[in-house]
Amino acid sequence: MKTLWRWLGRALLAAFALLLLWQVWLFAQVAWWRTHNPDSTSFMRLRLDALQEKKPDARLRHTWVPYEQISIHLKRAVVAAEDDGFVDHEGFDWDGIQRALEKNERKGRPVSGGSTISQQLAKNLFLSPSRSYFRKAQEAVITVMIEQLWSKRRILEVYLNVVEWGNGIFGAEAAARRYYGLPASRLGPAEAARLAVMLPNPRKYERSFGPRLAAHADRIRGRMAWAEVPP
């Protein structure tokens, strides 16, 4: 019996050591990306694998552009649509989380996550789309790392360059060229609002952008003037 407990203790210690090493690696990666642009993300690689299962030579559409080459209208539209308290919170919008929980309870199923831009970025960079308590806890840890090490400008820059905007389409530049034939720097308020409202389900909305979504884009456009973004 003592041998069993000894082996169990060693197994737990080894698991803890591996978890700690994983956190150290994550921290080092976040620190590196403070000044270096990520070539891809965990989610981008998952999507590429899925596309290549059907078409082996499939490629993602993705072109990195610096923050100053992204339209101010798109920055404001995304913040207005996804995280209107972005510049003020430290990674978590507790009021938004509470509203999401209440909405999910009314619907009887998860329909709203209440995730901030920082949380979405943490998930996209490192994690899978699966839902579990461990994944949410890890997302929270990475969110804290990002918020502590990066400026809000850097967070929004990376987010706008790696977020999904359609099937195989990632980042503002690829989205602007795919849907409007423009560089991201030249997007106007209307185009920006329409791109912003696609973010919750981009692969669905690129195929079906109906009147309901168009009305939502109009509402976002009306809120853009008050959306605060990093300079």
Swiss-Prot record:
Enzyme class: transferase
Residue pairs linked by disulfide bridges in the UniProt entry: none
Pathway given in the UniProt record: Cell wall biogenesis; peptidoglycan biosynthesis
Catalytic activity, EC: 2.4.99.28
Gene3D superfamilies found in the cross-reference section: Biosynthetic peptidoglycan transglycosylase-like
UniProt keyword list: Cell inner membrane, Cell membrane, Cell shape, Cell wall biogenesis/degradation, Glycosyltransferase, Membrane, Peptidoglycan synthesis, Transferase, Transmembrane, Transmembrane helix
Classification via HAMAP family: PGT_MtgA
Family indicated by similarity: Belongs to the glycosyltransferase 51 family.
Function text: Peptidoglycan polymerase that catalyzes glycan chain elongation from lipid-linked precursors.
Name of the protein this chain belongs to: Biosynthetic peptidoglycan transglycosylase
Gene designation: mtgA
